[in-house]
Amino acid sequence: MKIRFLAGLGLGLLFCFMGSVKAELLSVATAEVCAQQWASFVGQGQADELTKILDDSYQHTHGTGLVENRVEFLGALRSGMRKYEPIQLEEVKTRLFGECAVVTGKFALKVSIKGKMMEGVNRFSFVVVQTPQGPKIVSFQATAIKPAS
């Protein structure tokens, strides 16, 4: 009886341990969900939701070359200085490197900057890392694709 109890307890602890280890591993699906959430939150101007998935060290490089940190990027969204139309990520590809993922693809951009509309197609890359607080985006970079002449 004791052996069955101890065996059951041991298996239970093993499954609990394995479950907690799995929860901490970054997957392609988790990284892509993070990128899709970013697109949704930015496109809807939801800066408060965006703060939950951006790492404190977040760096945002715009297609224009402008580089902003987390505070600057969120501040422009909150103030209304920058308003994005809904963003749909396309051609999404993800590569895993341990607890880090690089998510790439393209999107059509429509944004109002201080009331002036700007639009175009961009390639993007996100760097997503697994942290003790869950997956976080540490970097975003857009590269404008010039229209064919």
Describe each PLM feature range.
Residues I87-L89, T104-K106, E119-F124:
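Short, surface-exposed coil-to-beta transition loops
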Residues L26-A29, Q46-F97:
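A solvent-exposed, acidic/Ser-Thr-rich amphipathic alpha-helical stretch
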Residues W38, E49-L50, Y58, F73, ...:
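Hydrophobic pocket/interface hotspot
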Residues E99-L109:
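A short hydrophobic beta-strand element
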Residues V121-A148:
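Short beta-strand edge/turn micro-motifs at domain boundaries
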Residues G12, M18-D56, S149:
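Short, low-complexity N-terminal intrinsically disordered segments enriched in polar/charged residues
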Residues M1-L9:
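Bacterial N-terminal signal peptides that target proteins for export
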Residues R82-K83, K110-E119:
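Short, cysteine-centered beta-strand-loop-beta hairpins and adjacent loop/turn segments enriched
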